[in-house]
Structures are given as structure tokens and as C-alpha cells.
Amino acid sequence: VVLETIAANLGSMATPIGNPQNLYLYSVSGLTAGEFARAVLPYSAIAFGMLMVIVFTQREVPLLDVVVKEKSDRLKKEILRGLIPYLILLGLCLLVVLRVLPWQPVLVCVMIVIFVVNRKLYLSVDYFLLLTFLCFFIFIGNMKRIPEVNELLIAMVQGRELLTGILASQVISNVPAAILLSGFSRDFSGLLTGVNLGGLGTLIASLASLISFKFFAREYPNQKGRFLKVFTLW
């Protein structure tokens, strides 16, 4: 699970849709696909090589026994049919990210389709997380309106985007760090690399780490300490 978490953090940095911070920074920065690739692909390639070395050199000792339940062919077909609307919506969203379609009509389309297909999904949305992001935008806007604070933060961040992104991610997680720091720098390539590499630090440094720990703790509550120990060592 720990290696999967590390792989998720490092692998997700390779594309604009790989993780929330990439999606946000790609949308606000105006970076082209080529500029984005030059910023993150070298690190992704190095990370892939290191993970392959670890996978093929470590002893094959499973952390815990996992039981996989086999699904019937009928159930598999039902699941596939149910995925079709979501795959279509995913395609539309990808076109928005690629700046082929405007986001406004796609947003309306997604909301209507979800309401028709599975309106219960609206009850499972993490509205607190969305509100947190909204508060970050408001906070950044307020800080930029205070000349002294704005100049101080710009002086702290500009020219140090990589290091600042890594350090800030350890404290407030990399998605909030990306949102916060983007208001005080124009070096989006350095910031992009910093918040992605910063996700490998503490448990709270990335949403992927928090999510994996949450699911692990729910399934194996007596093994939480072991997970934290292994995660910290890696």
C-alpha cells in the first residue's frame, strides 16, 4: 500500500489531469502541453526507474492477505453498461482540460446527467473540501490586496518556487499549497514541480497519502501504527 501511494504521487505528476494540483496549475498558468511536459516528465521518468528497481529487488512478502471476490459475468456487464454515461462525461471533461470545449456548458451537462443517472452522488460530494478551496481563493485575493503582505509573500516565493512548494506541502498538503502559492509567483513550472515532489514527505503532504491511510485504517484499524512506520521509513 505504501509503494502504491508513492507510485500514485509520482505517477500522477506526469499529466495535467493526474492530480488536483496539476489540473489547477495547468488551468491558471496558461502552460502549453510541451511546457508542462518539460517541467515534470524528467522527474516522472526518474521516479518510474526508482520504483522499478524497488519492485524487482524487494522480497515478495505481502503486507497483509487480501481476498478478491470474483464477480459474475452478468454483474460485470451491468457494471460496464453503468459506466458508459460516466465515460462520455469524462471525455467531455478531458476536452475542457485540453481547451477544446468551454467549461460552462460541460459543467451544466455533467450536473444534468448526474442528476438523471445517479442523483445520490450529490450527497457523497465532499462539500467541506470544496468550501476549503473556495476559502483559499478568497484568502489569496485578500492577501494580494494588502501591499505589505503581498510584497512580503512575493519576495518569499519568487525565485524559490521549487523549495517553497516542497516545504509548504509538508504543512498544508500539496493541493492547498499550489492554490496558495500560485497567487504570488509566475514561475508555474517550478511551483508545479515543487508541489508534486512535496507530496512525498509527510502523511498530510498529499491527498493520495491521506486517502490511502484512511482506507487502510478503515480496513485494518489495528495496523495503523505499522502503516505510519513503513510510510515514514519509505
Regions found by a protein language model. Name each.
Residues 69-81, 95-103:
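Short, amphipathic, aromatic/basic-enriched membrane-interface segments that mark the entry/exit
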Residues 88-186:
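Transmembrane helical segments that form the transport core of multi-pass membrane transport proteins
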Residues 22-37, 64-69, 146-156, 178:
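Membrane-interface helix termini and inter-helical loops of multi-pass transporters
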Residues 1-4, 8, 36-44, 129, ...:
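Alpha-helical transmembrane segments of multi-pass membrane proteins, especially transporters
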Residues 45-53, 87, 91, 134:
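Generic alpha-helical transmembrane segments of integral inner-membrane proteins
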